[in-house]
Amino acid sequence: MASEERDGDVLLQLHPEEVVETDPQLPEEIERCSGLDYNDFFWRYMHKNIPVIIANVSNDWECQNWTVGQSSPESRDLNSNPSASSINFDYLKTKISDGPVPVANCNSSYFNSHTKLELNFHDYLAKWRSSIESQSSAAWTSAEVNSNVAPASGDNLYLKDWHLAAQMPGYNFYKVPKYFASDWLNEQLIQQGKDDYRFVYMGPKNSWTSYHADVFGSFSWSTNIVGLKKWLIMPPGEELKLNDRLGNLPFSIDEKMLDEHNVRYYTINQRANEAVFVPSGWFHQVWNLTDTISVNHNWFNGCNISMVWQNLKNNLKAVCNEISDCQQMDNFEAHCQTMLRASFGINYLDFIELLEFIAARRLAEGTVATKFLLFDSYTMNDYHVQYDLECLWKITRTLTEDPTIQCSPLQLEDRCQGLLARLEF
């Protein structure tokens, strides 16, 4: 059943899974869907941790004005391959205030990462525009779709991980698609005014993102506003075939490398107005085959919260091993948690506080008349709220059995037991 309009917001209709698959099979290729309803996306892709491409998600977004084309977003061919003049630099400069933005130089690396720098946004636009005009970029051809981008000489500057939505909260340049609205991570961070995981990426042809899996083992989604991206993406576990003798993963991959190591992988050619859903633990690398702008989120919810917890535990173990020679020091466990937060982004206390926050809101759904709005647009039906509460109960029960939590001087077990008591039903 499709999401329903109610009092100006959209109701996320979730219903019990009709056919329970204990061992979901990987698809032969990544599906491209249009008109997918929320319930189907939830059970067919998100719950099974399977990627999908969803078309026609950004037709009415304000940021369609960031592109140069026909007279209105509705009349443009959003899936056409853009020319060098596709970026509306004048509109971007007028609409978005100047200020520092994070930039990666894709032609320079430092400790297995692209070199990072900071530029003022308007300076970045000027450099990008000048590069297009001076290079007279060759037209996109279909032959490029099946070949990786060859690095050019000089700087190759990619504006990445820009918190534009947080920086300009009054500028509603996009709307979170309904498929991705169940987002525990950003629900908490936005409400509490903390750094979130909502990003804008802008980059020229030949810019790219190196081989990685997403932060926390989270889901991610990426919607192209303009441009064409190529993805190489693989199911969890396949990345182990690429480890060197020290267990290190490569910085960059290509089809030849993957074929030589017998890696199962998929190729995605993502067009404008399409969203790619990236499940937890799927390693990937992405190339911009044309000048490209995208909106991206990292997030997790009841479908993958257990994977995030497992990654958190694994990273704590790695931290403890790294400083194992300091085990006799006072507050060793607390020091490990501090290092865990620094390296992983959250620690055990942060994770429990997030569970407490989401639980409080879902429990309130059953006791107050007003529903909480997700991203100012969406509410959950009763079954969806119940599903979230059941997932919260299961993961909290798992936490109470963890030795680190049981022995924590921060009384983490007491907090988990208290949360578990509130979730009993």
Curated annotation (Swiss-Prot):
InterPro entries, sorted: JmjC_dom, JMJD6_ArgDemeth/LysHydrox
Gene Ontology molecular functions: 2-oxoglutarate-dependent dioxygenase activity; metal ion binding; peptidyl-lysine 4-dioxygenase activity; sequence-specific DNA binding
One Pfam short name: JmjC
Residues given in the record as Fe cation binding sites: H212, D214, H284
Localization annotation: Nucleus; Cytoplasm
Reactions this protein catalyses: L-lysyl-[protein] + 2-oxoglutarate + O2 = 4-hydroxy-L-lysyl-[protein] + succinate + CO2
Keyword tags: Cytoplasm, Dioxygenase, Iron, Metal-binding, Nucleus, Oxidoreductase
SMART domains: JmjC
Protein known as: 2-oxoglutarate and iron-dependent oxygenase JMJD4 homolog
